[in-house]
Amino acid sequence: MAYDGLFTKKMIESLQDLVSGRIHKINQPENDTIIIVVRQNRKNHQLLLSIHPSFSRLQITNKKYDNPFDPPMFARVFRKHLEGGFIQNIRQVGNDRRVEIDVQSKDEIGDTMYRTIILEIMGKHSNLILVDENRKIIEGFKHLTPNTNQYRTVMPGFEYEAPPSQNKLNPYEVSGQEALKYIDFNSGKISKQLLNTFEGFSPLITNEIVSRRQFMTQDTLPEAYDEVMAETLLAPVPLFHKNHETGKEDFYFMKLNQFYDDIVQYDSLNDLLDRYYDARGERERVKQRANDLVRFVQQQLQKQQNKLSKLIDEYESAKDKETQQLYGELITANIYRIKQGDESVTALNYYTGEEVTIPLNPTKSPSVNAQYYYKQYNRLKTREHELDHQIQLTKENIDYFSNIEQQLDHITVDDIDDIRD
């Protein structure tokens, strides 16, 4: 969880340039994403608020989004209350991943009104809520009723309540020496105790504190804690890191000892997030859509394999054409011995010297029986050529779908669309 409370603090600091900016437009390009276009210093800034379970965040994005022709109801509510308004304040609640944006706007008759956007970044429980000046909920993206949530209600008309407090401490209000009071060196991992004690900490930052000293003692822990917390107050250094051993990707706003092999520095936190979440979003979209594609590919592969089996069986049967031709020839050669009504004739196969018994249609004349076998020969000969062509095409289809099945881990959304087409 790289977008922790400390990262949120840095992001809020970087967004202060938007204060006094005018809300020009509001869009909802994706189900869980709102884009607020803020006009400031004669330039438009896209403020992204996402409550995606895996990608929830707040940032300015330079990515271009396609907006639906008919905006969702949630976007319409935001437009009604916020468009044309001015941002008065952007603040973080404590050191948590909760952000509040105060907006001064005007209602339909021109009277001044005050609204607050509340973004709660909590993974799958993330929410986006709009409240009035009395903290009454106007609308929430995720409605929580007393029947579905025992802690609070998020419904229009109800007073806003914050998520249940975990009673954690703000790490910026606690020194390293004071932090010792909450750590038991005999009660398990120090990093986990730090995580459970301090608001806004993530495993990334608690592991960093522990890694700053070879051993954690009553002397080294306060030193490492103060050292890391002091560095979080410096100007941000937006870094992207990929661990080549595990393949895991991370980002943060400062240099970490854990980032040691492949590191890329970006010009801003927003550029960093665009790169990180765009790549992750692509993989997530691929994963979601690939589930259907996997089933489709497997079904097609099975279908083609079954088809090939039937074609091969039919092809083997078509090889019997030479027998049909032989029967026609032998009936013609022995036609003087055959009369209508005979059910079979035994004749000498002049190719092998063996006798052959040939079935006859007793209702037909000897010449009609001979023509029947000649027609069978010609039909099977033509069919054999058709089957040979179909078998080759089917084998190519099997190779095609087999290759797709092997490459699904590296496929893109565009590739999926191409395959579906």
Regions found by a protein language model. Give the residues of each.
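Extended, highly charged segments
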Residues: M1-D421
